[in-house]
Amino acid sequence: MNIRDLLNQRVLAAMATCGVPADLPALIAPGKKAGFGDYQANGAMGAAKAMGTNPRDLAGKIVAALDLEGIADKLEIAGPGFINIYLKPAWLGKQIALAQTDARLAVPQAEHAQTVVIDYSGPNLAKEMHVGHLRSTIIGDSLARLLEFLGHQVIRQNHVGDWGTQFGMLIAELEEQLGAKGDAALELKDLEVFYQQAKKHFDDDAAFADKARDYVVRLQGGDAQMLKLWQQFKDISLHHSSEIYQQLNVTLTDADVRGESFYNDDLAPLVKALQDQGLAVESEGAQVVFLPELADKDGNPSPVIIQKQGGGFLYATTDLAALRYRVNTLNAKRIMYFIDARQSLHMQQVFTISRKAGFVSDAVSLEHLAFGTMMGSDGKPFKTRTGGTVKLAELLSEAVDRAASVVSEKNPELAGEDIAEIARKVGIGAVKYADLCKTRTNDYVFSWESMLSFEGNTAPYLQYAYTRVQSIFRKAGVAPETLGSPILLGSEQEKALAIKLLQFSEVLDQMAREAMPHLLCTYLYDIASLYMSFYEACPILKEGVDAEVRDSRLRLCHLVARTIAQGLGLLGIEVMERM
């Protein structure tokens, strides 16, 4: 059930009856304040302006033509022509009953399913994942989960950095450390240390540096020994990433990896295609595409090097090849890139070239979904105390440890294994939610204290709200699926909660459209807050509560729990029965 869509259809039909042109919107939105309707239709003002008529008069005609029999209690015109719509509690109760028994919580699947490619995470395999990878990984994953839930075919693409000149240095170092034999996994147990050793060796030893450069040429030429060492390095690095994904409860698998190396064979043909079209031209020995569309303030076109003077290719070349593959082979109709805001110009260049070259038609949506930076309490990018990058594995481990302290303090009687499992869900959930609940494009300050709080818009607060509902059912001794009584919405709290529950589909649609997970977080927090108000005002298991009223309230409770669990699940956050 999508109330907004239903009202939109009905109001548009009424507007058409009143002679309003079909391209003018009904502008349906939930009521913002008490006393201004459960929903508002705000299209009369714009329509009246376009038609040269009085907005209140037009609103009156729309109301007269509006068929909401059995759905709305009351329609009223406010201000210059707002139409306030008050929904019938009996109708809302029926919709709640349908949602409560529906496997999908009455969320319809998308009418026009698409193939959506989502490019996210993308760590460099030469280094361990750090906090800078967190945002792309969890924001991208939440959209992948959501779009699949809505019925789209989602193809995850983990565009890892597995190619480039640094691999000559790393392979040479690995070969020397392995000697005649040895365990590569053991040598690479700390990728960060290994990378630093290789870099120092490269900087300090000219002979080693020459060997590293030679190894790059051999690797790029397909030398079997170089490829074998490179593959070992790649496998072990990917295993590190895979462990992080499992810890984070992220859906990326090895099958989703499409490293830069995957596109190697297409780079030269791609450059030739751009040359043949006159888009790529020689400039100082390099092949460059000049884009007047992205000119600087002095009118100089934006230069994009796609092949260096020595014949080497660049990130832009690989990204263009990846884009061509995603459109031609994967048949993507929407391609979403969850990449740092600092790559904004680069992505604009890639998108512009791909359109001009005809690699991508106008029917394909290309979206760079940039995000802000995680900051420390000093207002600078989040670092260790010594100023180094924070490893993601260490951050997640600390989150679980801190959550274990909080959980054991609140519930000292819990068994050790229960504390460990709850702490894992609370700690990882807290880190993810603290990020996802912020507007994607904004920077935010990382704070252990606020993210692990059981108050406010946090994962622990929502997880706790879920467990409270579960405890009510244990106390009542009732299985939710046995409840079949009508839903009675006799109080303001019950009605407010019911309307919010029925807006789940609207919120998911908006999040899918705008790629903004904070919209879902805000919605879930609103649900939990309205539930707490309902719980305080509407007794459920107290003596003297009528059986039909009790069962109706239990059904509302059940839908609250399922909505929180489903919503958090789409964010990749787990719930627990007890806390």
Swiss-Prot record:
Residue ranges annotated as motif 'HIGH' region: 123-133
Record carries keyword Aminoacyl-tRNA synthetase: yes
Keyword annotations: Aminoacyl-tRNA synthetase, ATP-binding, Cytoplasm, Ligase, Nucleotide-binding, Protein biosynthesis
Assigned EC number: 6.1.1.19
Predominant cellular place of this UniProt entry's protein: cytoplasm
InterPro entries: aa-tRNA-synth_I_CS (IPR001412), Arg-tRNA-ligase (IPR001278), Arg-tRNA-synth_N (IPR005148), Arg-tRNA-synth_N_sf (IPR036695), ArgRS_core (IPR035684), DALR_anticod-bd (IPR008909), Rossmann-like_a/b/a_fold (IPR014729), tRNAsynth_Ia_anticodon-bd (IPR009080)
Annotated compartments: Cytoplasm
Broad EC category: ligase
CDD domains the UniProt entry points to: Anticodon_Ia_Arg, ArgRS_core
GO molecular function annotation: arginine-tRNA ligase activity; ATP binding
Alphabetized Pfam families for the sequence: Arg_tRNA_synt_N, DALR_1, tRNA-synt_1d
Biological processes per GO annotation: arginyl-tRNA aminoacylation
Keyword Cell membrane appears in the UniProt entry: no
Stated family: Belongs to the class-I aminoacyl-tRNA synthetase family.
HAMAP family from the UniProt entry: Arg_tRNA_synth
Descriptive protein name: Arginine--tRNA ligase
